[in-house]
């Protein structure tokens, strides 16, 4: 009987990925503009800032310890519940599903700053124009690139597919998108008692926090 790790991975849906990426990048930016308006009107409460700090810290752990050290580099081993928790926290950062993220980062290390590196700033041509293009590509442009994605996932994802915890968390990525915004909203609503205060908490603990994670 053929195991999961021996099966070919599903073909990437590039259109869906680009749509999700565009939403994931643009909505937090809109959230920051809303937050600036709220801050101008002094509509920021301790619970909003607490949610911002706590969720920024937790998702940072999910990306650095989970997505990067554990799933990309296999730097340590841990239990299935901890693998699931780290993968979910990383998903809360809205940087993509755990399998795709780990595959692209493995590819980055395999082709660091040469042709094939998915987000190198040094392969976009010479001169000032090349540097500007490279800066944009390395910061955000590569999110929308489909060059070599299917090949990198075919090469780098077999051990990830072999882990049922990782597969399930990756498959439920849209749920984590809802929860990364829904949990701050629910806490803000529970503390403040109104939908508006729940919305404020979602802006600070969700959208602003995601924006900071993407750009800082």
Map each language-model feature to its residues.
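Non-catalytic, topology-defining segments of multipass membrane proteins
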Residues: 1-215
């Amino acid at each position: 009987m053929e195991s999961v790790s021996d099966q070919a991975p599903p073909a990437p849906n590039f259109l869906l990925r680009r749509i999700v990426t565009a939403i994931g990048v643009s909505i937090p930016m809109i959230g920051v503009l809303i937050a600036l308006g709220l801050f101008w009107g002094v509509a920021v409460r301790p619970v909003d800032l607490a949610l911002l700090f706590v969720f920024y810290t937790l998702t940072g752990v999910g990306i650095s310890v989970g997505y990067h050290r554990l799933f990309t580099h296999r730097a340590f081993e841990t239990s299935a519940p901890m693998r699931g928790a780290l993968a979910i926290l990383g998903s809360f950062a809205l940087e993509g599903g755990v399998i795709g993220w780990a595959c692209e980062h493995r590819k980055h290390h395999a082709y660091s700053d040469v042709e094939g590196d998915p987000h190198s700033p040094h392969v976009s041509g010479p001169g000032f124009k090349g540097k500007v293009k490279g800066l944009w590509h390395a910061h955000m442009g590569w999110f929308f690139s489909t060059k070599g994605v299917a090949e990198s996932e075919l090469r780098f994802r077999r051990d990830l597919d072999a882990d049922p915890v990782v597969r399930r968390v990756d498959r439920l990525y849209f749920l984590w998108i809802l929860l990364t915004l829904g949990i701050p909203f629910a806490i803000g609503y529970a503390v403040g008692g109104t939908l508006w205060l729940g919305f404020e908490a979602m802006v600070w603990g969700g959208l602003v926090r995601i924006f900071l994670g993407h750009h800082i």
